[in-house]
């Protein structure tokens, strides 16, 4: 449990569990272990190599159990991401709950239907595979 929490609560490891095609780089704020109020700035190129700046704030941390990040500036109108980590028999389970909304009204809803929903899903599937390769798969 401590090993998993140590990895997941270190912002520098986010690049490790993000697909390369996202062009993800941390610009600032990842030089300390996670804490409530921490601001982390990123740049990523998820669509056609177009760079997006993304600023998130870690709003809640309960060491060893969960943390929450919220977008302060970036591609979404709203982004609220809860990461729960719990010890289970013979392992650790991580659960992500993400609520988000795209800008631009109908166009945003259309983009979500057309590709964003599947892109977000594929990113979290990639993370699951990476975490399994790092920590092992729970059977």
Residue ranges and their predicted role:
Residues 1, 33, 59-66, 84-93:
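A short, structured loop/turn motif at beta-sheet edges
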Residues 71-122:
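Beta-strand/loop substructures that line and gate deep hydrophobic ligand-binding cavities in soluble
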Residues 17, 97, 133-137:
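Amphipathic, soluble alpha-helical interaction motifs
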Residues 1-35:
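Hydrophobic ligand-binding cavity/cleft-lining segments
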């Amino acid at each position: 449990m401590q090993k998993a929490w140590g990895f997941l609560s270190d912002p520098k490891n986010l690049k490790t569990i993000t697909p390369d095609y996202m062009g993800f780089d941390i610009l600032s704020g990842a030089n300390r272990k996670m804490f409530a109020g921490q601001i982390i700035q990123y740049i990523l190129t998820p669509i056609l190599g177009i760079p997006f700046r993304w600023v998130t704030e870690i709003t809640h941390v309960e060491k060893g159990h969960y943390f929450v990040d919220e977008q302060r500036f970036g591609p979404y109108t709203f982004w609220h991401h809860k990461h729960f980590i719990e010890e289970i028999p013979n392992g650790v389970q991580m659960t992500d709950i993400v609520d988000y909304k795209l800008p631009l009204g109908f166009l945003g809803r259309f983009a979500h239907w057309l590709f964003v929903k599947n892109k977000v899903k594929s990113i979290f599937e990639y993370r699951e595979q990476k975490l399994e390769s790092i920590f092992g798969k729970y059977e």
